[in-house]
């Protein structure tokens, strides 16, 4: 007889009508339960540790343990000592990429200053390294990091007009009470 778990009684009768009975109890292992848990990914492109464990069934188990993975959906099959199998599926998420941007006001006069505005987005707010910065002409790099310490950078070049150079010349006055012609010119600036 093919039977599942349970208690069964069997009555046996021979050709002469003599009979006897027997009872048997068949047990089975408890159902195997497979579970998974994962650590959080703090920065885009980072790794999570997935822990897969099993209870029930018959030890030892094959397929349990810790697994290092990137974001995505994963299915982990586990087999017990009797060859019975079950699986668990887990989805790992990650923050978006931290991005930084910068812009600058114009320097109107040679030797002046500009205001560079640095902002962040993506990742996990709030951000460090953002704000407004007063700078002279040059190239600047700013590092922006989010609440999880994930960082990126932005660079900006601030230009300025050339220096205004003024030159002048005058013709000589030849006679007392005479006049001179003065010429004034400027180069540079805007």
Task: Report the location of each language-model feature.
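Proline- and Ser/Thr-rich low-complexity, intrinsically disordered segments
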Residues: 1-190
